[in-house]
Design a protein with these regions (language model features):
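Conserved catalytic scaffold of divalent metal-dependent phosphoesterases
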Residues: 2-123, 147
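Conserved beta-sheet core of the metallophosphoesterase superfamily
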Residues: 97-188
C-alpha cells in the first residue's frame, strides 16, 4: 500500500475493508476472550490506517512503532471507511464477500446490487477477484482492479483450479463533478 501511494502520489486515498480483514476479525473473535476482544479494533486496517501499532519481535526482544499510515504521507488525505464499499463522486469502490468465477461476473453482480441501492453512479471498481478487467454496460463502466500483492507467495488457492491472479491496479480519473473520465482512466498491469 505504501509503495502504491508513493507511486501514484494521490491527493486522497479511501481504504475499504475486504474479506482478508473480515477473516482476521473472525479469527480474533473465536480465539480471544470477550474482554480481550474489546481491546482490539474490528480489523487490522484500523491499526494500520488510524491508530498505529507496535511490532513485537520476541526473538530479539525489541519492539518497533509503526505510525498510522494516514500520518506518513504529508498532503495525502488517507482514511479507512470501515465498510466493504464507499462512493466517491459517481464511482462506487467495493470489496464484496461474494465471488463468481466467470470473467467480470462478480462486477456485474455488484452493479446489479448497487443499482437497487443507489442508481446514481457511472463507474464501479471492484476488488476481491484479484483480476484485471473492464467493460461498459449501458451508462456504467465496470472495473475489476487486480491486486498489488506478491501473488507468487499466496498459496491459498493452490489446487482449486482457479484462474491465475492478475497483478495491477486501476488509475481512475474523475472530473470536478465526480464523473468518470474514461479516456484518462487506465488499468495498469505489472
Amino acid at each position: 500500500l505504501i509503495d502504491l501511494i508513493e507511486y501514484l502520489a494521490p491527493r486522497r486515498v479511501l481504504i475499504n475493508k475486504g474479506n482478508h480483514e473480515v477473516r482476521f476479525g473472525s479469527y480474533l473473535a473465536r480465539s480471544l476472550d470477550g474482554e480481550l476482544k474489546e481491546l482490539m479494533p474490528e480489523t487490522a486496517l484500523d491499526l494500520i490506517v488510524n491508530d498505529g501499532f507496535h511490532h513485537y519481535d520476541k526473538r530479539t526482544r525489541t519492539k518497533i512503532w509503526y505510525q498510522p499510515i494516514r500520518d506518513v504521507f504529508e498532503g495525502v488525505d488517507i482514511s479507512y471507511t470501515g465498510d466493504w464499499w464507499c462512493k466517491l463522486g459517481k464511482t462506487i469502490f467495493a470489496h464484496p464477500l461474494a465471488y463468481s468465477g466467470g470473467i467480470l461476473k462478480t462486477s456485474e453482480k455488484a452493479a446489479n446490487h448497487f443499482l437497487r441501492m443507489d442508481p446514481d453512479f457511472d463507474a464501479l471498481v471492484l476488488a476481491h477477484t484479484h483480476k484485471l478487467g473492464m467493460y461498459r454496460e449501458g451508462n456504467i463502466t465496470l472495473f475489476e482492479q487486480g491486486c498489488c500483492c506478491l501473488t507468487e507467495k499466496m498459496d491459498y488457492a493452490d489446487g482449486k483450479l482457479t484462474m491465475p491472479q492478475q497483478k495491477g491496479f486501476l488509475y481512475l480519473c474523475q472530473d470536478g463533478e465526480g464523473r468518470l473520465l474514461f479516456d484518462r482512466t487506465r488499468l495498469v498491469t505489472f
